[in-house]
């Protein structure tokens, strides 16, 4: 197991115990991989984390996962064993396969409504990436307006009710990066708490969630990773003490 260090080309296959526990191929700074960590931690599902250098991937990764993508979940107890990709599909599988602490609503209509809101968030994260690259901030704020209204309509502390649910976790990685966006944009950053009163409270509640806390990363660390990536030398091991 990588123990937090990102494995690169030439790295041997990690010595993971043959214990039947799920193996998650991940990257510490990837918001899509973060979704899967959040679900695994929220549901308290045991798993091994294997972090991958996506710039210089280890050769054996393509044997496990021909797409070479993260997140990828290896289900070692199944024949094969199969490797699942795509964060939303992995998270849905986990919620169905491990029914304790359900994250998707049990009601079919509410489940579909949450899925639609997760799908709709694709446009919001697209606007986020453009804003973080110096683009107009307003499309991102306009996208968040939808979730501000929805949280107000539900009248609950979280989108999942009185505890976190799937919608909370699927949009969180980009909401966590609001502080990163603030660093990137400086004086241009114009998040308005009066425009987002419900989301502002939700952000603070989410920061106290155990699953969120387990994978939370300070904006300054995220910014430093992006700085090294912009120089063509991404430091994937910023969080490794002896990196």
From Swiss-Prot:
Keywords: Oxidoreductase. InterPro entries: Glutathione-S-Trfase_C-like (IPR010987), Glutathione-S-Trfase_C_sf (IPR036282), Glutathione_S-Trfase (IPR040079), Glutathione_S-Trfase_N (IPR004045), GST_omega (IPR005442), GST_Omega/HSP26 (IPR050983), Thioredoxin-like_sf (IPR036249). It catalyses: 2-amino-6-acetyl-3,7,8,9-tetrahydro-3H-pyrimido[4,5-b][1,4]diazepin-4-one + glutathione disulfide + H2O = 6-pyruvoyl-5,6,7,8-tetrahydropterin + 2 glutathione. Disulfide bonds: none annotated. The active site is at 30 (nucleophile). The keyword Aminoacyl-tRNA synthetase does not apply. GO terms for biological process: eye pigment biosynthetic process; glutathione metabolic process; pteridine biosynthetic process. The keyword Oxidoreductase applies. Residues 20-102 form the GST N-terminal domain. GO terms for cellular component: cytoplasm. CDD domains: GST_C_Omega, GST_N_Omega. Disruption phenotype: Sepia eye color, due to defects in 2-amino-6-acetyl-3,7,8,9-tetrahydro-3H-pyrimido(4,5-b)[1,4]diazepin-4-one (pyrimidodiazepine or PDA) synthesis, a key intermediate in red eye pigment drosopterin biosynthesis. Homodimer. Belongs to the GST superfamily. Omega family. This is Pyrimidodiazepine synthase. It comes from Drosophila melanogaster (Fruit fly).
């Amino acid at each position: 197991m990588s123990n937090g260090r990102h494995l690169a080309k030439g790295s041997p296959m990690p010595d993971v115990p043959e214990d039947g526990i799920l193996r998650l191929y991940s990257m510490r700074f990837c918001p899509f991989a973060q979704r899967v960590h959040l679900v695994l931690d929220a549901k308290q599902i045991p798993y091994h984390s294997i972090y991958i250098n996506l710039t210089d991937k280890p050769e054996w990764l393509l044997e496990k996962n021909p797409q070479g993508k993260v997140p990828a979940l290896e289900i070692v107890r199944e024949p094969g064993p199969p490797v699942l990709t795509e964060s939303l599909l992995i998270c849905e599988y986990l919620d169905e396969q491990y029914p304790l602490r359900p994250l998707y609503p049990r009601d079919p209509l509410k489940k579909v409504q949450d899925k639609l809101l997760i799908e709709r968030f694709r446009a919001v994260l697209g606007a986020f990436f453009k804003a973080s690259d110096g683009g107009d901030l307003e499309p991102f704020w306009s996208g968040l307006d939808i979730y501000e209204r929805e949280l107000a309509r539900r009248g609950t502390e979280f989108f999942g009710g009185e505890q976190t649910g799937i919608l909370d976790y699927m949009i969180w990685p980009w909401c966590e990066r609001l502080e990163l966006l603030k660093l990137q944009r400086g004086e241009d950053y114009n998040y308005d708490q009066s425009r987002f009163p419900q989301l502002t409270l939700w952000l603070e509640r989410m920061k106290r969630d155990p699953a969120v806390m387990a994978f939370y990363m300070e904006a300054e660390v995220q910014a430093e990773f992006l700085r090294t990536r912009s120089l063509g030398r991404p430091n994937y091991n910023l969080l490794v003490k002896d990196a």
